[in-house]
């Protein structure tokens, strides 16, 4: 079986995604770091099970310029993992690391697994950080995504940020409409109303019979219990 993760604590007051109240325990962080390695080293981590195998892990058809091939594969991977394009210095560092791993292991796939593990262990992946630039479109994309989807921005949202469509009212409205139609909006609908209206407290309350003579729960369809 799979051992349970250490508890990921919610914010004690207000909504559970308030950044100034969230913490990541050293125990949970260590578990995430080990997980990034164990997934990539799993015997089930194969071409048939991994959607980006051909684009990222597969041996290149033309290995003449290995460094250029690694760079080409890392750019979109890092963009999704870090929720914005990597700075040149950061990208260069991962390219050098991957190149060294491929050479030392004599295996392109093995080297790319190691660099993927390193990326998934980075604070830039594990933590959300706000840019000091007020008009950073990628920071806005992350805020929208985590607010409405409870998850990282997808490729389409990052592309909208890249193209500057989040910087004007018409473009932002178009993006928001697309996000609201996406199935991932169900996460928001499940969590926000319950937290906003404090339904957990309502379900735990016991109505006073004298004040609430007509209160009852249909035992055959207890809707309040399935919230």
Residue ranges and their predicted role:
Residues 1-227:
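Low-complexity, glycine/serine/threonine/alanine-rich intrinsically disordered linker
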């Amino acid at each position: 079986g799979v051992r349970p993760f250490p508890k990921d604590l919610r914010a004690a007051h207000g909504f559970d995604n308030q950044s100034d109240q969230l913490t990541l325990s050293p125990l949970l962080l260590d578990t995430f770091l080990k997980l990034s390695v164990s997934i990539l080293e799993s015997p089930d981590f194969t071409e048939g099970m991994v959607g980006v195998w051909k684009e990222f892990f597969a041996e290149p058809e033309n290995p003449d310029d290995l460094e250029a091939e690694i760079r080409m594969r890392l750019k979109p991977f890092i963009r999704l993992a870090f929720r914005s394009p990597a700075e040149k210095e950061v990208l260069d560092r991962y390219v050098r690391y991957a190149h060294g791993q491929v050479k030392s292991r004599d295996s392109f796939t093995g080297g790319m697994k190691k660099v993927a593990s390193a990326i998934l262990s980075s604070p830039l992946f594990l933590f959300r950080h706000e840019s000091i630039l007020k008009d950073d479109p990628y920071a806005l994309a992350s805020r929208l995504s985590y607010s409405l989807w409870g998850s990282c921005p997808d490729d389409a949202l990052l592309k909208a940020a890249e193209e500057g469509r989040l910087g004007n009212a018409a473009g932002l409205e178009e993006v928001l409409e697309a996000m609201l139609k996406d199935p991932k909006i169900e996460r928001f609908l499940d969590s926000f109303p319950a937290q906003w209206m404090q339904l957990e407290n309502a379900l735990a309350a016991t109505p006073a019979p004298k004040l609430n003579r007509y209160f009852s729960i249909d035992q055959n369809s207890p809707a309040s219990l399935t919230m």
